[in-house]
A protein has these predicted regions:
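Acyltransferase donor/substrate-recognition loop-hinge adjacent to the catalytic core
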Residues: 125-208
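Short catalytic-loop micro-motif centered on adjacent basic/acidic residues
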Residues: 103-104, 175-177, 292-296
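Aromatic (often tryptophan-rich) hydrophobic motifs at membrane interfaces
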Residues: 233-326
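Conserved donor-binding loop and adjoining core beta-sheet/short helix segment
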Residues: 37-116, 240-269
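Short, conserved active-site entrance elements at the starts or edges of catalytic domains
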Residues: 184-244
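A residue-level signal for conserved active-site and pocket-lining positions in enzyme catalytic cores
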Residues: 22, 167, 309
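Amide-forming acyltransferase catalytic core, primarily the GNAT-like/NAT-type
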Residues: 2-57
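Conserved active-site alpha-helix within GNAT-family acetyltransferase domains
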Residues: 112-133, 162, 300-317
Length: 326
């Protein structure tokens, strides 16, 4: 699918060539949510499903799913332009969609909503927004101080230290390397397939079917990551044990002092590997990139993932909102 015209608004394909355009708008924002980067959106979008337009001097990112348009981010631009852009984006979505029920804007940062509330100049448009739209808190991003993840001090990190020590004792010949998209591609895809197989073994059939649908998207994301690894300025580590790749992690810098983890996988059978590679990645980010905080994204609503992310004692939780129409 090429470009799309909806309600006289041309929507262009969201491709790798969109990177400098989107990043021009992102660079003017002060936001530490993991969703507000080009790479985080590009690698997860299925082929041909992403579109963008510059509306009211704002970058507007849309996704087409099952014929319905939604927005992956709010309009990116100056505060004075964002409200009108949002209203126009809903008009575009409504013109395309089978029902206004499907029109929504995901991953809205709290600061954008607070700006609407606090600005006297926007009082009229804020009233209009409250009259016509619903704002719902969805997920939170988990943000950690990097020094805490490296040092793992105190009783709250006792289990993490124990797991890492057991790993180092069991696998003293481990090898850590910076991720190379050519050298490590085959090993990472093999590990990913094993990871999927190990997970499915212990799942009820119905749950496994839903899980495998999501895995198709994640496999596509990893392939996109390899295809444009250097171009996307991604940062990664891999770990080898006895010549086999047993773990990898990939992230990127999202601001001067904050980095994010996009994808991480380790072999379930290698106990302590996940904790170890997370600490080593934290070390690399601090030593080579001067990073002070790591954002590991949200828990996607999964309780087990929430427990794991809370167990690392986040420095802060950053809320994300979805805007619907009434």
């Amino acid at each position: 699918m090429g470009s799309l015209t909806v309600n006289k608004q041309k929507l262009k394909r969201f491709t790798i060539t969109t990177k400098p355009i989107m990043e021009k708008y992102l660079s003017k924002l002060d936001v530490d949510l993991s969703d507000y980067t080009f790479a985080a959106n590009y690698i997860w979008l299925a082929n041909s499903s992403g579109f963008y337009a510059i509306i009211n001097k704002c970058f507007c990112l849309f996704i087409m799913t099952g014929g319905e348009l939604t927005m992956l981010l709010p309009p990116l631009g100056k505060k004075k332009n964002a409200t009108d852009a949002m209203i126009k984006c809903f008009e575009v979505m409504n013109a395309n969609n089978s029902s206004p029920y499907y029109s929504r804007i995901d991953y809205v940062q709290a600061a954008m909503i607070e700006d609407f509330v606090q600005s006297a100049d926007e009082a009229e448009s804020m009233f209009q927004m409250l009259e016509n739209y619903l704002v719902e808190k969805k997920l939170v991003d988990y943000v950690y101080e990097i020094n805490a993840l490296i040092e793992l001090r105190g009783n709250s990190y006792h289990t993490k230290r124990t797991e890492i020590n057991k790993f180092m004792k069991s696998y003293p010949d481990y090898v850590i390397e910076q991720l190379d998209s050519v050298k490590h591609k085959e090993g990472i895809m093999h590990l990913f397939d094993k990871w999927v197989s190990d997970r499915v073994k212990y799942m009820p059939k119905e749950e496994a079917e839903v899980f495998l649908e999501g895995i198709h998207q994640e496999r596509h994301a990893i392939k996109q990551m390899f295809k444009h690894y250097d171009e996307l300025s991604l940062i990664g580590l891999v770990i080898y044990i006895n010549g086999e790749l047993k773990g990898f992690t990939v992230g990127e810098r999202i601001s001067q002092d904050t980095a994010t983890v996009i994808i991480e996988k380790t072999d379930f059978e290698v106990l302590g590997c996940a904790q170890f590679i997370f600490r080593e990645f934290s070390k690399m980010l601090k030593e080579h990139y001067g990073v002070e905080y790591i954002n590991v994204g949200d828990d996607m609503g999964f309780e087990n993932l929430r427990k794991v992310k809370m167990s690392y004692r986040p420095f802060k939780l950053v809320p994300k909102y979805t805007i619907y129409q009434k």
